[in-house]
């Protein structure tokens, strides 16, 4: 990533917090920057001490005997490496050392439920299967902004001691205590040990942790909204917290430390609601590298797909060994009505808890309240330093964007009505606000132009039913992957809009300086919220199948997902929006067949992407090599639960996908292949063989799918579904073929 200023977006309660940061941090050491020095796997010899080795390397490169201020992190548990402050010339010398696998800058990353689990069918009661004793031995590692340990969602009432496999520690720092629910905590953000604390000061980490594994807490709500029982997917599971994010963002070198510790601590699933601001190659992606090491020892990494949709090729979680999650809306939404002076009611979206008591306030358009120093276009957007306080004080301000809402409140506005850029989600603000659709916003402007004294009031929010759910959220990042064209990303979709979950009272629900509210539960949106839903489902599946590998769990969730849709046309409305579909926790525990992958399969896949042996080792951390034969591996033949290929849109093509399934259903079963094509499909799809006869558990059988067509064009991907059915199980795999101009 190029040096310079990037923006980090923290999706806390629908608030976009913009923070300026430098991609490779410069500090007080002149032109030194923080780099991650990756040395691969840990040597097996007993006398090897990583820390001493890392310090020795630094002393050799820098020529300095005292290098404590240079060494930032030492990775010494699950893989080998360190982070250090280096000059450019020192970086080059390090990169040239034979034993150094790679040196890359520590980048900034960004942070990206009362009804959501019920919506997915995972309801509490006798109809939902649970194995509490095994669930209690399950540990979810949450890499995020910390946690508020005093929340009822993390009470350890009824919990026994941590599982025997737990090897971690509670290093939460000052004002932080672990218990038998939150069994581990570490902080990587503090500049000194004295300031270390895993406490969550943004609310984001608390929210995500409770979605994955929070206790069932009755009467949870946000000022009465969303009232119900908030709980995680596996309420009896344990939580280990790894704080890598603060108000300056999330450092890549801290992320690597979190992976190093989490893997060694013994977690079963890792949930990361954090994404890079750009899309680096795997060998420079701390999540991809850390997750590869996790996968190699049986730990599944679940990652948010990103919040940069609906633009195509914005999904940042692209490695096939990382479970990438898109966000969907559920069957519940929040609205805030706007009542005009003439009695007309407009339906807006908002999580508004403020009551105007039915009082009508004067309306003023931002562009009509502009300072002379500001252009009308900027004032129309209510941009900072554009509004005249005398003209907005005591009024409801109309804004064409959210940019100046805090400014309007600061100048004395009593509320605001905003043109909604994302009509499928509601926002929390620090004073009365309603977000209107384009049509309703035009109606409001028309009303203002038709009367001398336009007035309105904004009502408190109400809950409404969303009959269109599940539907992919507009903001959810889309594929196809810009790194790997023949792997469908994102993988799966889960609830990520207006999710009520635990929150940290150490932060306001909007992080606005004017917001004095402190809450125990709040409503947030983003793929950050979708990610822990899938982490919870993965942990739930693992309680029934403790010996399953990460790829088996991922396959079970993907092949049992609900088919779904996305609004719009072209790429943004296809599987590149929602992957395999919407997660179904109940069916995922009994998939029938799974597509299994090993570390060796992923290495062959990387070789097929033309990775050299040197680049391969950056990710694998071992002595793997790419031979000529292995390098002929087609990436689309990775044994993935979906099938995707990029082709020429104007020429005939004939491509094949090779797959192998493992029987995890009934000992003796016969699966028949069925191809479901959409109306008007130009694809010819053949499956060989069309029948798979399984005679034993864990038996593997292979098949080939051949897809051909004269041409498909470049505007609309063409897709179908392959379903293997034995009458009980329906193992569904999307097939998508596309071309891009």
Swiss-Prot record:
GO terms for biological process: proteolysis. The C-terminal propeptide is autocleaved. It is found in: Secreted. CDD domains: PA_subtilisin_like (cd02120), Peptidases_S8_3 (cd04852). Residues 116-589 form the Peptidase S8 domain. InterPro entries: Peptidase_S8/S53_dom, Peptidase_S8/S53_dom_sf, Peptidase_S8_Ser-AS, Peptidase_S8_subtilisin-rel, Peptidases_S8_3, S8pro/Inhibitor_I9, S8pro/Inhibitor_I9_sf, SBT. The keyword Chloroplast does not apply. The active site is at residues 144, 204, 528. Belongs to the peptidase S8 family. This is Subtilisin-like protease SBT4.4. It comes from Arabidopsis thaliana (Mouse-ear cress).
